[in-house]
Each structure stands twice: as structure tokens, then as C-alpha cells.
Regions:
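N-terminal helix-turn-helix DNA-binding core of bacterial DNA-binding proteins
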Residues: 2-39, 65-74
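Conserved alpha-helical interface elements of two-component signaling phosphotransfer modules
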Residues: 42
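Beta-hairpin "wing" of winged helix-turn-helix
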Residues: 52-62, 69
Length: 99
């Protein structure tokens, strides 16, 4: 996967929130995301499917649950770096629709 394709996969706000949680918690199931992100289960499942198709997350079965985790250490490091860097950049535009 090239850089722009990777960024396209993670640029959605919900997908990035999922990855931030995974970066901190290592492994979660769909219900964990629903509870922590306060978003509907079908939406979370859709975004996890997209992240899995991109190769960014992997899943394993644990009983009736699918447990999701970031697929490799470099991706976890990337998510951490993006989060830390974005927190240090001043907000230049308060209207995200016009930026």
C-alpha cells in the first residue's frame, strides 16, 4: 500500500478514533468501541471492516466475539505520532468545513 492509500484509509474521524483506542488498549471487540465512542454498532462494524480490508487492523475470534487489533507495530507508532503531532499544532481554522 502506498502512502496516500494508507492515509485515505485512516483519514475518517471514526476510523481514526478506533485506531487511537486500539493504540492504547491493544485489542477490543465491537461492543467495546460502541461503548467507548458512543456510536452505533453498524457504523463501528463498517469502519472496522474498512480498516481490515486496508490491512490496518486484524481480527481473531474469541468465542462469539471478534477481537480487533492494529496489524503491526509501525502502524501503532504512526497513529501515536499523528496524535501527538496534531495536539501540538495550533488550530488555524475553527470551521472544519472551510479548511
Amino acid at each position: 500500500m502506498n502512502g496516500p492509500a494508507l492515509l485515505k484509509c485512516i483519514c475518517d474521524e471514526t476510523r481514526f478514533e478506533i485506531l487511537e483506542l486500539l493504540q492504547k488498549d491493544n485489542e477490543l471487540c465491537v461492543n467495546d468501541y460502541v461503548e467507548k465512542l458512543k456510536k452505533d454498532q453498524p457504523l463501528i462494524s463498517h469502519h472496522l471492516k474498512t480498516l481490515k480490508q486496508c490491512g490496518i487492523v486484524k481480527s481473531r475470534e474469541e468465542g462469539k466475539k471478534a477481537m480487533y487489533s492494529i496489524s503491526n507495530l509501525q502502524l501503532s507508532t504512526l497513529i501515536s505520532t499523528v496524535t501527538k503531532t496534531s495536539n501540538k499544532i495550533p488550530t488555524l481554522c475553527n470551521d472544519e468545513n472551510s479548511c
